[in-house]
Amino acid sequence: MTAPAKQIVIITGMSGSGKSTAIRALEDSGFFCIDNLPVLLLPKLTELAGGGHFERMALVVDVREGVFLKDAPRILAEVRRAGHQVEVLFLDASDDSLIRRFSETRRRHPLAPNGTVAEGIKAERQALRDLRELADQVIDSSTLNVHDLKRMVQARFSPEPAAGPSLSIMSFGYRYGVPPQADLVLDVRFLPNPYFVPEMKGLTGKVPKVAAYVLEREETQQFLEKVVDLCRFLFPRYQKEGKAYLTVALGCTGGKHRSVAIAAELTQRLTDEDTRVQLWDRDIEKE
């Protein structure tokens, strides 16, 4: 009797990018998790976990693999051929962000115990280059705190089934930077800003009167119709190319009013039985 197929998430990426946070997020979501399992043991693990045991597993694979890291592409292909669903999540961050994090924790880089963190980062990027190219999704954690990263990972690997793509709608403020993980970025700063209406300045786009101020305009409705049409045009074509997860980011100046209202409305319009949509207001709580 053939063992049931398993959902296997391989978490990899740069040291200091948030792999520990990601594996804990999946553990909290019901995954059986192993940190630093030698990749050569993955086929044996799936064999030992046959039957109905550990149907959802998450593993960390990183530079601690050493010389065995080069075997990762071959091993992952072998496990996929066995019928298992294998997804690779690569966590990254800018060099400046990684250096700052190492400085804050006073840790040495694993690839440069006697050198600088910058030297270790450079060597690690080279070592992980092939694995990064295999990634089904790359998350840049440069601007994310641990709570944001946990929320993103859990949303990405939610067990809820969907026949179509999984979609993340994100509102953000340009003053805090464009989210690097976005596949599509749409600027809604052409719409009138509730910030300049005294009674709305301290509110957000989640408040009904603020949302109405943004949404009850002809140009807003035209914009939403065009964005929905664009998304529905793109989704099946992304799926055809093997991309099952999309992030659409909507930005205004501060990420509190216009983008929040538009993101909520877009989420409502795009959610159906074939598409799982996750809404995330990245900057709504920032000062």
Swiss-Prot record:
Coiled-coil parts of chain: none
S-adenosyl-L-methionine is among the record's keywords: no
Residues that hold GTP according to the record: 62-65
Domain of life of the organism encoding this protein: Bacteria
Gene3D superfamilies per UniProt: P-loop containing nucleotide triphosphate hydrolases
Residues making up the signal peptide according to the UniProt record: none
An MF annotation (GO) of this entry: GTP binding
Cited InterPro entries: P-loop_NTPase, RapZ-like, RapZ-like_N, RapZ_C
Matches recorded under Pfam families: PapZ_C, RapZ-like_N
Keyword field: ATP-binding, GTP-binding, Nucleotide-binding
Binding-site list for ATP: 13-20
Biological function: Displays ATPase and GTPase activities.
UniProt record similarity statement: Belongs to the RapZ-like family.
Protein name, entry field: Nucleotide-binding protein MXAN_6564
Organism expressing this protein natively: Myxococcus xanthus (strain DK1622)
